[in-house]
């Protein structure tokens, strides 16, 4: 110790009491990192009874002496000074310590817990400055029989503790399992004798004085390393004007320090970062203090694992939780598993928060990469349309108009995983209990109103499903779904949310994920620390635990019921015909709608015969895929009957194996729903006498026509249309549209838009409201073939909806890379650079394209590469697109051989008679008259309407032939039975 430190009063706090005359005092403040410096002070001129060393016994009254001093001053602020130092005993420092105005040495002597050591002749300077008062107080204590001077017979012997063998060092005689069995879950009183590191303490268990080492359950503090036996003790040098302890000193080893030194290795290993700070944190709170220990378990090395609780004023605190919350220990799963679930969750949550806040030992923590991302403020209400599996639903958003395909949102239930349904195309069978899980939700949710809280999205990895290289990333959206109108049986099965949750963010109702788990139809996903998870994760864990305890569903030892289903949709048509008699015998057959294949065609499951069939309405047809209103018809049917219980009557089966008949849902003929909405029409070729409730279907169709709904929006009642002049009557009823031509191709083909269609104005308004941003960053947006985007038309720089027709095979590397795009609302097609395309909002891209491909009926027009092809194309362009007129298009037939729309000239083609509103003859007849087209070849099996139309057109062709104009200038031309393919015209057209 520096000489200047003697005889100077310092301030500190009592950290530990090692005996009845010795304290460890730490500085109140310090200027360096880490724990404050400390001093070990023995009271000058006093000698308290000595505590037992290992294998020894106490001196009489040693424990009472130490306890008196411990209870008097532990954790309290004191003032002290060093009176003298004895080099012969490792430089031990002796001094005077005051608690407030009380001299602690005087209090100890006065109560008889220490005797006064008188100085020898050679040590006259090694004496307390209060020696006279101490001697007087000692004499009084002797006279009164206080403390060690007790005059009670046998008091000295009774004060000696009967110490059991120590459980530290040589633990051969210590029965850790027996101690645990006797005290499991019970709080045990103890006094902490030593802190080995932040999460390991050595304790006297009361009242037996069993000396044990306890590892704090669920946590692990940084290691203190291994130390040599020549340990150093801190020395104090005054460097503050107020006299606080602020430097280091050497002092004698305490009993606890000797215990640590005895187990130390001769090889020194440095401590981990924050180890010293964690140790001091624990010392400051529990060393030499009363604690309560709850034993949780014993590890394979016979070490005790327990929770340690201490008092902080009126509050009882958990040492392990405090260490973790302050970033001085980490959560340890293996020992936390011994604890109660609630305590374990608190530790885990505290560590996660410290990692997020980068506290202490987590300052440089970098969370592992995660493929999940939180979703904020995307809650909605809607109706369940489809149960995909036990953990995935499709919900129609109430905020989106009824019937819109954009209304449907796929929601995966957060933080749970149900058995997979498999994939019939890849010959993957459903996992055990997969069908049961889906059916369980189907019966409870289909058609029900639910509340959805979106919580996070996750990037789909290869483990989640097949991916193709270069394909755009796919994301799955997860959320919690609540059923407000749950049945009482279901409500009773799940844990009711606390009142605070109901008043806060949790909707009133049953959490569907919780219901799935309680029935044993799923497991809770064990997320990594920083992965997003359900906001109701704890409730899900509790539900899973209940299913495990009850051995329900996938947790039971029973195998799931085997089910063999005959799928006639993938079988030969002959097999379907074999089933026809058995289905016709039953008047109304209960069935479940498995899929909506189109507006009028479905896949049904018939439980009675465990069979799946393809089913279509008799005499009712919806627009085909790619045609206007086809998607809306599908959407309406999904909302109305998807996965619902229905009844069917089978009338016949077609050549493809599809059964034809009628369907009822809740006693309503489903076909009437489509007809009333203007999304289907009756087929006159199918005898009305063969259709059940045909009169209802006719009434529904008539109602839609009168209101001009959907496909009937341009319908004109009783209108007669001629290919030649207005006096020739077409008796067969045909659909008539009012249109404007937007693009002319060649070979008599062109694109039209419906005139006055409100959808056109709606989409134009949506596009006008968009804020077109700068070109996307290279690599952030990689559109592929078939994607709908925004593209800038080269002629007027307007932004329009477009479909990618061709795209670079590799990821985009330059803003000049070329994409061929098809403008789905106009029919134009051109090549544009990457810089001229943008991503499009799904709400704008969802509506079908407004441009409809058409071809002039009953005539053959030369292609652009043929003779008179350019003249024909120019004429058609002039009289249609160039005139700006409005036309009536009479649909003679629909050609679906073009398949889906993939670009210009593809998709369903309307074969039409086109006539301007103010003209007497059709464009078809006019082109024959100009000699730039010829009639189709007559066919013997053509229907009467077609023959009549050809008869009316023939006079116009004869007029051109006789005048030898156009293609007839050299006389008759050879008949060509084949239509020539149209060539594409450079982009242009109407805007």
UniProtKB/Swiss-Prot annotation:
Residues 227-250, 971-991 are annotated as: Disordered. GO terms for biological process: cellular response to heat; mRNA catabolic process; mRNA processing; positive regulation of gibberellin biosynthetic process; regulatory ncRNA-mediated gene silencing; response to salt stress. GO terms for cellular component: cytoplasm; cytoplasmic stress granule; cytosol; endoplasmic reticulum; nuclear envelope; P-body; perinuclear region of cytoplasm; plant-type cell wall. It is an enzyme of class 3 (hydrolase). The modification Phosphothreonine is found at residue 980. It comes from the Eukaryota. Residues 8-151, 186-364, 378-557, 587-714 form the TNase-like domain. It holds the Pfam family TUDOR. Induction: Accumulates after salt treatment. InterPro entries: Silence_cplx_Nase-comp_TudorSN, SNase_OB-fold_sf, Staphylococal_nuclease_OB-fold, Tudor, Tudor_AtTudor1-like. Residues 782-847 form the Tudor domain. Expressed in seeds, leaves, flowers, roots and siliques (at protein level). Accumulates in the cap and elongation zone of the root apices (at protein level). GO terms for molecular function: mRNA binding; nuclease activity; RNA binding. Its main location: cytoplasm. The modification Phosphoserine is found at residue 975. Repressed by the specific inhibitor 3',5'-deoxythymidine bisphosphate (pdTp); this RNase activity inhibition impairs subcellular relocation upon abiotic stress and leads to reduced stress resistance. Disruption phenotype: Normal vegetative growth, flowering time and flower morphology. Reduced expression of enzyme involved in GA biosynthesis leading to reduced levels of GA-4 (e.g. GA20OX3). Slower growth in salt conditions. The double mutant tsn1 tsn2 exhibits severe alteration in germination, growth, and survival under high salinity stress. Reduced levels of stress-regulated mRNAs encoding secreted proteins. Abnormal stress granules (SGs) and processing bodies (PBs) assembly accompanied by reduced uncapped RNAs levels in heat-stressed double mutant tsn1 tsn2. Its EC number is 3.1.-.-. The modification N-acetylalanine is found at residue 2. TNase-like domains are required for relocation to cytoplasmic foci upon abiotic stresses. This is Ribonuclease TUDOR 1.
């Amino acid at each position: 110790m520096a000489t200047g430190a003697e005889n100077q009063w310092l301030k500190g706090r009592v950290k530990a009491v090692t005996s009845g005359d010795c304290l460890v005092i730490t500085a109140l403040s310090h200027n360096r990192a880490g724990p404050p410096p400390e001093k070990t002070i023995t009271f000058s001129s006093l000698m308290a009874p000595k505590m037992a060393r290992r294998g020894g016994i106490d001196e009489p009254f040693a424990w009472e002496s130490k306890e008196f001093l411990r209870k008097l001053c532990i954790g309290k602020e004191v003032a002290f000074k060093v009176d003298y130092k004895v080099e012969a005993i490792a430089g031990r420092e002796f001094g005077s310590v005051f608690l407030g105005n009380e001299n602690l040495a005087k209090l100890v002597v006065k109560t008889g817990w220490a005797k006064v050591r008188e100085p020898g002749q050679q040590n006259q300077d090694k004496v307390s400055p209060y020696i006279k008062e101490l001697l007087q107080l000692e004499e009084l204590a002797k006279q009164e029989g206080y403390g060690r001077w007790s005059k009670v017979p046998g008091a000295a012997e009774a004060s000696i503790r009967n110490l059991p063998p120590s459980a530290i060092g040589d633990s051969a005689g210590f029965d850790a399992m027996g101690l645990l069995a006797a005290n499991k879950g019970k709080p045990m009183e103890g006094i902490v004798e030593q802190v080995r590191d932040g999460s390991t303490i050595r304790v006297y268990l009361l009242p037996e004085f069993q000396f044990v080492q306890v590892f704090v359950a669920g946590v692990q503090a940084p290691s203190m390393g291994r130390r040599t036996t020549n340990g150093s003790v801190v020395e104090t040098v005054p460097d503050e004007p107020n006299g606080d302890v602020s430097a280091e000193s050497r002092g004698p080893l305490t009993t606890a320090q000797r215990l640590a030194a005895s187990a130390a290795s001769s090889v020194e290993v440095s401590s981990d970062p924050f180890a010293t700070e964690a140790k001091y944190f624990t010392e400051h709170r529990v060393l030499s203090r009363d604690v309560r220990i709850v034993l949780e378990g014993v590890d394979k090395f016979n070490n005790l694992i327990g929770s340690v609780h201490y008092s902080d004023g009126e509050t009882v605190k958990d040492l392990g939780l405090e260490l973790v919350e302050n970033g001085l220990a980490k959560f340890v799963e293996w020992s936390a598993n011994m604890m109660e679930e609630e305590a374990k969750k608190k530790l885990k949550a505290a560590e996660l928060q410290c990692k997020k806040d980068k506290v202490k030992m987590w300052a440089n923590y970098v969370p592992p990469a995660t493929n999940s991302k939180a979703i904020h403020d995307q809650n909605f209400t809607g109706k369940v349309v489809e149960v995909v599996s036990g953990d995935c639903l499709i919900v129609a958003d109430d905020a989106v108009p009824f019937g819109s395909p954009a209304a449907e949102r796929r929601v995966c239930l957060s933080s749970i995983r149900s058995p997979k349904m498999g994939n019939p195309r890849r010959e993957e069978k459903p996992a055990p209990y997969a069908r049961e899980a889906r059916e369980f939700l189907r019966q409870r949710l289909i058609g029900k109103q639910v509340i959805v809280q979106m919580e996070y999205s996750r990037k789909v990895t290869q483990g989640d499903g097949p991916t193709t290289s270069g394909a755009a990333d796919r994301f799955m959206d997860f959320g919690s779904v609540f059923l407000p109108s749950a049945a009482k049986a279901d409500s009773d099965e799940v844990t009711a949310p606390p009142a605070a949750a109901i008043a806060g963010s949790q909707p009133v109702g049953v959490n569907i994920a919780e219901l799935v788990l309680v029935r044993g139809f799923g497991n809770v996903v064990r997320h990594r620390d920083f992965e997003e998870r359900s906001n109701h994760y704890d409730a899900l864990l509790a539900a899973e635990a209940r299913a495990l305890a009850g051995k329900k569903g996938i947790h039971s030892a029973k195998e799931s019921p085997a089910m063999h289903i005959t799928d006639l949709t993938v079988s030969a048509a002959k097999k379907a015909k074999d089933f026809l008699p058995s289905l016709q015998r039953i008047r109304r057959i209960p069935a479940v709608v498995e899929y909506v294949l189109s507006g009028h065609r479905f896949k049904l499951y018939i439980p009675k015969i465990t069979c799946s069939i393809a089913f279509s309405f008799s005499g009712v047809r919806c627009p085909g895929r790619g045609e206007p209103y086809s998607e809306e018809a599908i959407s309406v049917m999904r909302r109305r009957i998807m996965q619902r219980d229905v009844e069917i009557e089978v009338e016949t089966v077609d050549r493809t194996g599809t059964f034809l008949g009628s369907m009822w849902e809740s006693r309503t003929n489903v076909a009437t729903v489509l007809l009333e909405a203007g999304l289907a029409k009756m087929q006159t070729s199918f005898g009305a006498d063969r259709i059940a409730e045909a009169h209802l279907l006719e009434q529904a169709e008539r109602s839609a026509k009168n209101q001009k709904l959907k496909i009937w929006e341009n319908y004109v009642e009783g209108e007669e249309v001629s290919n030649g002049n207005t006096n020739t009557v077409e008796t067969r009823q045909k659909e008539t549209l009012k249109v404007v031509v937007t693009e002319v191709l060649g070979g008599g083909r062109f694109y039209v838009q419906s005139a006055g269609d409100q959808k056109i104005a709606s989409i134009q308004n949506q596009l006008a409201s968009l804020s077109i941003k700068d070109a996307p960053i290279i690599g952030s947006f990689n559109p592929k073939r078939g994607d709908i985007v925004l593209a800038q038309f080269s002629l007027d720089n307007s932004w329009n909806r477009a479909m990618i027709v061709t795209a670079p095979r590799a990821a985009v590397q330059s803003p000049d890379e070329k994409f061929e795009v098809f403008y789905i609302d106009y029919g134009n097609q051109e090549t544009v650079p990457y810089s001229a395309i943008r991503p499009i909002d799904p709400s704008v891209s969802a509506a079908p394209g407004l441009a409809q491909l058409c071809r002039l009926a009953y005539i053959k027009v030369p292609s652009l590469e043929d003779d008179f092809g350019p003249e024909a194309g120019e004429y058609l362009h002039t009289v249609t697109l160039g005139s700006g007129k409005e036309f009536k298009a009479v649909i003679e037939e629909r050609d679906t051989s073009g398949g889906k729309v993939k670009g210009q000239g593809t998709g369903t083609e309307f074969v039409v008679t086109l006539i301007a509103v103010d003209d007497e003859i059709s464009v078809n007849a006019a082109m024959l008259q100009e000699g730039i087209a010829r009639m189709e070849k007559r066919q013997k099996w053509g229907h009467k309407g077609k023959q009549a139309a050809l008869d009316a057109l023939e006079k116009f062709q004869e007029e051109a032939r006789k005048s030898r104009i156009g293609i007839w200038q050299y006389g008759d031309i050879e008949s060509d039975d084949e239509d020539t393919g149209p060539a594409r015209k450079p982009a242009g057209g109407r805007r």
